Amino acid sequence: MLKSIGLKFALPAALVGGCFFLIVKAGSFSKPDPESPVEPPSKQTASVWNSSDSIFQPYGDAVKGLLTFRGNPTRTFYGTGPFPLQTPRVRWAYPDRGSMCSVSYLGDKGDTWCGMGWTGQPAVFEREGRTLLAFGGFDKKVHLMDASTGRDVKTPLLTGDIIKGSPTVDPDGYPLIYLGSRDNNLRVISFDGEALKTLWSLNAYDVKPVLWDDDWDSAPVILKDYLLTGGENGHFHVVKLNRSYGKDGKVVVRPKLIANVPGWDQELLAVFPKPAVSIENSVAIYENTVYFANSAGLLQGWDLTPLATGKPPKRIYRFWLGDDTDASIVVDRDGFLYVAVEYEIGNQRSQFVGQILKINPRIAGDSGIVWRHHVRTKKPDGVWSTPALTETHLIATTDSGKALGINIKSGKIDWNLNYGNQPLWSSPNVIDNKLLLATCDGLLDAYQLNGSQQPRKIWGLKVGRGCFEATAAVWNGRIYIGNRDGKLYGIW
C-alpha cells in the first residue's frame, strides 16, 4: 500500500500519465474468449495443503468462527447469517470512553492514527460458550473481547506501533492469535492466561535482505502446524509452530523459521522504478500452491510440497501485473485466480494489464488472462479492497467509489453501484445473498443480490464519524467493524 496508511516510504512519481475507464473483454490481446470453454487448472489427487472443497467454507471444523481475513485460506468465506433484513442499530462502541489512538512515525514525522484501518477485519469465534472478538487497533494494542458486550475479556497486549492488519485465530483450537504490527514484529499470542501474552515473535529483519519495509499487514495462514505469511520485508515465510500444551495445561509453541523466500527477482527489479516489493496481501492457498503478489505487482505461485522433504517452496508461477497489489488473491473451486490491482505508478504494463483480472495460473504469461477490466478514472485509482466471490459473480470495490458485479464466466460487468468518487477500501461481504458495503463517509449499506440484475438496497446505516477502511466481520448476523474515528462497533 503506497498511501499514508501503508508503506513508510513513498514510491516515485508515475512513469506514464493518462487515465480512463475502459472495459477490455476477453478475446482482445490474443486471450481466450470467455464465452468459449477455458480449460480449468488440473486438480491434484494426492494429499494437499488446502483442498478445493474449502472454497466458500469455514476454516476447518475445530473452531467455529471467522478466523482470518476473508475467512479461510482461499479468502472466500465471509461469515454467517441470518443477515439482518431490517436496519440494525449500534449495540456498543469500543472503547466506551475515549478512542483507540496513538502516534506513529513516518521517518521523523509523527502523526496521530485513530481506530482501525486497512485491512483491520476482526476475527470472531466461539469458545467456551461465548462469542469472542480478536483485533488489533491504532492504539498499538491487541484486544480480545466479548462480542456481545464489547468488553475486554483479557488485558490487551501493547505492541510498539500501530496494527493495520487482520488477526488469525488458531483454527485447530489452540488458544493462540497470530498478528503483526508496524513495530517490525509478527507475534504468536496466547490467550489462556489473565492477559494476552507474546509467546514468540519474528522480526522483519530476522531475514536478509529486507526489501522494502518492515511492517506485517498479512493475516497468516495456519495449516499442518505451519504458519505461512508474507511480510513487508519482501519475503514469504514458513514457520513450523510445534504447538503443544505444557504440564500446567498452558499452550506452548516452539516455532522455527524453516524457510523464507524473496518475493522478488532480478527481472522485476530491472523494470520497476524502486525496490518496492513488500507483501501486504494475505496469502491464499489452493491445494499445494500458495499465491500472493507484492507492491511491485509480481503475482506468484509457490509449490509447498517440497516442505515435506525439508526443502523450501518452489516458485511455479510468475505474472507481472505492473503496479502495487495489496488486495489478497481470491481462488475459486477450479483454481482460477481473481486479482485486484491498484493504479499508482501508471506504467505501460499496468495500463495494458488492467486492475481487475481473472487468470488461469496453469497457462504462462498473458495467455493465461481469461478476462480483465481497466477501472481507472484518475491516479491513484484501482482496487485496494479484496473482492468477494460468489457462485456467479466477483464483487469488487474501487478507489473511485464503484462497486462492480462482474460475471465470473463471461467477464461482463452486470451491475455497478456508484458512490461518487469516495474511496471504497473496506472489502465487500456477501452473506445469505446479501451484499454489505462500508464506505468512507461512515455508511453501512446492505443490498439484496439478484444475479445479473442491479442489487436492491434494503437498508443503510450511518455509523460513527470517520471512514471505514477496515473490513467488517459478520457472524450469526451480527456485524463488527472498526472506523477511523477511533471506535470498533458492534451492530445488530
Q: PLM features: what roles do these ranges have?
A:
Residues 1-15:
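N-terminal Sec-pathway targeting helices
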Residues 21-32:
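Hydrophobic single-pass membrane-insertion segments
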Residues 3, 27-29, 409:
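Intrinsically disordered, low-complexity segments enriched in Ser/Pro/Gly/Ala and basic residues
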Residues 3-4, 21, 197, 305:
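Polar/charged alpha-helical tracts
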Residues 32-61, 69, 76-119, 123-217, ...:
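Extracytoplasmic/lumenal domain signature
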